[in-house]
Amino acid sequence: MISDLESLGIDFKDEGENYVPKKDYSGNLVAKYVFDSNGISTDNITLKDLSGHGYDGTMSGVSIKDDSELGKCAYFNGSASVNFNNQIIPKGNKTIIITFKKDSGTQSNGQYEFLIEQGSGQGESITSWSIRFDSYKTACLNNLYFCNDDSKINMLNSHPAVFNVCDGKKHTAIFNYYDNKTNNTYCDSLKAHVCSFDFNGGEYRTADNSIIGQKYVGYIKSIEIYDDVVEFNSISTGTSLNKNIDQLIIGQTDNLVATIMPEDVTDKSVIWSSSDPSIVAVDENGKITALKVGEVSITVTTNDGSNLSQTCMVAVIDTTIPDKACLNISMTNGQVKQYYVGMDLVNKFISWYKLRSAGSEEPFYEFDITQLSEPGILRHDYVVFNKISSFTVDDYVK
């Protein structure tokens, strides 16, 4: 099924892109062939249909080799083939995915090399369906075609990004057929289709059999055939926020903006969440609202299956609350008086202490404040200057 493509060594990740199937196509898999120990019988005669539909083929002259790019694969020498008693290419909507490596310099004019050849159309001279290297004309050399009888042919090299697939290198081709509608072909990339056109002349389907590798010189790693058009979505490869740290006052709002990459991502929707909505709420558009003092993380997550996320830390403050500190006054009798006060009161105490040391001000300082040891009681506390040994100030960060 389509999720097996990665395990087959097929990589449709273009630079800055990542792709996932638009849906689960496993139920549309008609036939699947892999030229390795899982897909070939121990006697090297039967090519198994791993889809479970029983479209097995009989191999003749096919060599199984280890290739540096393809791994375990089949080599066809021009006379080898795999023969089937069935038509493995279905009628109607279809996708055929082939991973191959074609030897260079093996073609000559007037020669066909078939990756797949499926029977002759009713009395027609050309096969009803074929995927072939076609060198009928000099301009066709080194090209791979997707053909239906005498209709228009879909060739890989018609796109400037594909110069030559007969270059002794690994390639993956995707041929889509939309049941007499627009047909798209891809090669090694899903960023842009290689070519697109409407087939003419209809679609032939006869009782003739199918052959893999007829007259072909080169390697085949795998073939997958579907009775639906396999399409892909571009999913995000990265995301960012316009800010990663923010500070708000209670009641204040701000807008976080998420940027999803690349620009052509199919689904750019995101999900916003707050680690504590009672402190900072966030709506579906990234608007945040500060509700009470505290710190939270606001997270944005892509909704296309890539599950990429970014976080902004938001601190909420209340400007009506002054800076706080703990004033520790050590008395000559060893007692330590602690006062949880604002910095304005600390500064007033320090000013009084300095002036009293110079001989002015009252001989005592009055605190009308809540004491740390008894936070629920308002105290009127008097500190006598001559009884003070020392004092310290501890700032509170929150």
Curated annotation (Swiss-Prot):
Residues 240-306 form the BIG2 domain. InterPro entries: Big_2, ConA-like_dom_sf, Invasin/intimin_cell_adhesion. Pfam families: Big_2 (PF02368). SUPFAM superfamilies: Concanavalin A-like lectins/glucanases, Invasin/intimin cell-adhesion fragments. SMART domains: BID_2. This is Uncharacterized protein CA_C0552. It comes from Clostridium acetobutylicum (strain ATCC 824 / DSM 792 / JCM 1419 / IAM 19013 / LMG 5710 / NBRC 13948 / NRRL B-527 / VKM B-1787 / 2291 / W).
